[in-house]
Regions:
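Histidine-/acidic-rich catalytic cores in large beta-rich domains
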Residues: 1-267
């Protein structure tokens, strides 16, 4: 979908941080850089439909994904990670047809991203969900974290099937079993450990890069399918709480969480 008009609903200049906003509309094939007044200052045309996220690198290049047709029929699927310069030229790319949602460029030039792997039904460990709702491909898709170097060689991998405490975090009773838990963010911290968000079970967890085990975890049903947890310089974690599927009125919030107390310090 291409936006018909950019604009600003409300702009309090004294409270807003002066910056640009990178806007990648789902379902489209463009990515836009927007100023504080809502004016488009830069547009990239992608070589296919947008996968999901986009981000600007320190060198000004755009890191983004587009969809491939070979992956499972999920949303939001990507499959093709691209680094595009200011002139629109592709200067790096990597294809993994099971890539989805989030990705990060590391200080060493490597790229970490979320992917899936299909676990056959008879081998899958699944708690909760709707029995018989496994994916038509023949099993359940579990999340995988992968890191590739500039040549596209995989140098590190974390597999959900090897480390995730399934018995502790069952799927909600009405959830299909075609995919387990729906990871949507992988934020790489300065120490290399990775903060991951699983939307369908309202869980965020910090994964130890060396052992693969959880160093810290927090779950709160009131988040209603969170996105984008990130660690601040003070150690706190911000996230976007979608607030969907709530008992009461649905509403979204931005939260700042003290990970030591597991308490909301700001919203």
């Amino acid at each position: 979908m291409r936006p018909l008009k950019f604009g600003v609903t409300e702009f309090n200049q004294s409270l807003a941080f002066p910056s640009f906003t990178l806007f990648a509309p789902s379902g489209g094939s463009q990515c836009f850089l927007i100023d504080m007044l809502g004016e488009c200052r830069k547009e990239w045309t992608l070589p296919g439909p947008l996968g999901n996220y986009g981000q600007l690198l320190p060198n000004g290049n755009l890191l983004i994904t587009v969809r491939t047709s070979e992956g499972p029929k999920f949303n939001p699927i990507g499959g093709h990670i691209l680094e595009i310069d200011w002139d629109g030229d592709i200067i790096w790319e990597h294809i993994d047809h099971l890539q989805h949602h989030d990705f990060n460029r590391l200080p060493n030039g490597n790229t970490t991203y979320l992917s899936w792997e299909l676990i056959p039904t008879e081998d899958a460990e699944v708690i909760g969900g709707v029995a018989g709702s496994e994916h038509p491909d023949g099993g359940i898709y579990y999340d995988v974290l992968r890191e590739v170097n500039a040549d596209g060689d995989m140098v590190w991998e974390w597999r959900m099937v090897d480390h995730f405490p399934f018995e502790k975090y069952p799927l909600r009773p009405a959830r299909p079993r075609e995919e387990y838990a729906h990871a949507n963010c992988c934020f790489v911290q300065p120490d290399g450990n990775i903060l991951v968000s699983w939307r369908d079970i309202d869980l965020i967890a910090l994964i130890d890069r060396k052992s693969g085990e959880f160093l810290w975890e927090m779950q709160d049903r009131r988040w209603g399918g969170q996105h984008d947890p990130r660690q601040l310089d003070n150690g706190n974690i911000t996230l976007f709480a979608n607030g969907s599927e709530q008992v009461g009125p649905e509403y979204s919030r931005v939260l700042e969480i003290d990970p030591n107390k597991k308490e909301i310090g700001w919203s």
